[in-house]
C-alpha cells in the first residue's frame, strides 16, 4: 500500500502496464479497511496483522502512521520480536522463567537456549510470524511472560488510536474504530482488553 506520498511514483509503471485511467488513485490498504468498516470513511482503523498501522479520517483530513513498527503498534512480527527479546531476558536472568522459552526452542528445533541464541547471532536464524498464535495461546493459558508481551502490543495499538483521534480533532466525539488483521480478529481476550 501507499505508506508515503512518494510511494505513488512506484505505481506509475503499474498504471501504464494496466492501461488504467490517468486519474487512478492508489491508497493504503488501511484506508480501504476503514471504508469497509465505516461507509462514511470517518473514524479510525487499527491494523494488527503481519505488521501494524493506524489510520484515520475526519471530514477534513486523512492521517496514517508510518507502518514501520517505529513508535507505533506492530503486528505479529512485533509480537514475535518481543517474545525473542523476552526469552533472551530470561536467558540473562532478568525475567523469571516462562513457557515462551520452550515454545521458541521447540518451534525452532533447538534443545537448549545457548545453541538457539548462537544460531540467532551467528547463523541469522529468524523467528517467523507463525509463532504469534502460539504466543496468544500461552497468554490465554496464563503465562505471565506471554501476557506481558501481548498486553504491550495491544496497549500500543490503543495508544495509537487515541493519538490518531486527537490528531484528527475528533476527541470528545463518538468515533467508530475498526479493528482489522489477524491479531485483532484472533479472539484473544487478553489482546482485546
Predicted features, each with a name:
Residues 1-25, 37-38:
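Short beta-strand-loop/turn "lid" adjacent to the catalytic site in phosphate-handling enzymes
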Residues 9, 50-63, 132, 187-193:
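Acidic-glycine-rich active-site phosphate/pyrophosphate-binding loop
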Residues 16, 34-44, 84-193:
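ATP-binding/phosphotransfer module of carbohydrate and carboxylate kinases, centering on a glycine-rich
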Residues 2, 68, 180-182:
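Short strand-loop junctions, especially beta-strand C-caps/beta-turns
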Residues 40-95:
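Glycine-rich phosphate-binding loop of actin/hexokinase-like ATP-binding domains
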Residues 3-5, 32-34, 53-54, 184-186:
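Short, active-site-adjacent cap segments at secondary-structure transitions
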Residues 24-32:
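A short, structured active-site edge motif that brings together acidic residues
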Residues 15-25, 59-69, 193:
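Glycine/charged-rich beta-loop-alpha catalytic/anionic-binding loops adjacent to active sites
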